[in-house]
Amino acid sequence: MHQFQQDNQYFIFNFDRTFEQATEFFQAEFWQKQERVIGSAKGRGITYFLQTEDWFGVNCALRHYYRGGLWGKLNKDRYRFSALETTRSFAEFHLLQRLYEAGLPVPKPIAARIQKGKLGICYQADILTEKIENAQDLTALLQTQTLPKETWMQIGRLIRKLHDLQICHTDLNAHNILLQQTEQGQKCWLLDFDKCGEKSADFWKVQNLNRLKRSFEKEVGRMNIQFTEQNWADLTSAYHQ
């Protein structure tokens, strides 16, 4: 792992070297000129999927951090700087690395950057993470098919592993769970650990699960996904084992 500074930019890479193109790696235009953009997804901004296996060992997802809500209308992507390790991209990078090393199915963090403004008070942030191949988010799949009991139980066990590490996923919802098709069957992954972190005690774990259930119920009405109380019972049964 290598952390370094170039002018008003700070980088961390999951490699023991410095890259001359460090700045360009976080610019969509660079990858477009290289003809290495292989897809994209829209959220608050655009996440670009990049062909980088020959450079980084895996293909990557490039994401810029944007604010949501009312603040996002006034200030779309600047955050107040206090310490490097607590910036949005560096904090998510380190949390992903911790979970990855613990064996949880999360994207491997590849690199993160922050760029300070002229006064050094605010910063903008970006992150590069592993792209999970041959995968769809849960809501996309549930619009066209039901899932077997074992898949719901796998999701429950995954969330339990996360909670056993005292990590609270503050945006735990059906869109942040991916299902990957492998030769061994379906594998569940968790995404988007921005603003997530360690939390003491246990009271929040039930609240976290309830948040996930509400997201499923919301998408039943909004996207007509196939989700039942029995699915939830299978998930929570595995969680409590």
From Swiss-Prot:
It is found in: Cell inner membrane. Pathway: Bacterial outer membrane biogenesis; LPS core biosynthesis. The active site is at 171. It holds the Pfam family Kdo. GO terms for cellular component: plasma membrane. Its EC number is 2.7.1.166. Optimum pH is 7.5. GO terms for biological process: lipopolysaccharide core region biosynthetic process. Coiled coil: none annotated. Keywords: ATP-binding, Cell inner membrane, Cell membrane, Kinase, Lipopolysaccharide biosynthesis, Membrane, Nucleotide-binding, Transferase. Belongs to the protein kinase superfamily. KdkA/RfaP family. This is 3-deoxy-D-manno-octulosonic acid kinase. It comes from Haemophilus influenzae (strain ATCC 51907 / DSM 11121 / KW20 / Rd). The lineage of its organism: Bacteria, Pseudomonadati, Pseudomonadota, Gammaproteobacteria, Pasteurellales. The gene is kdkA.
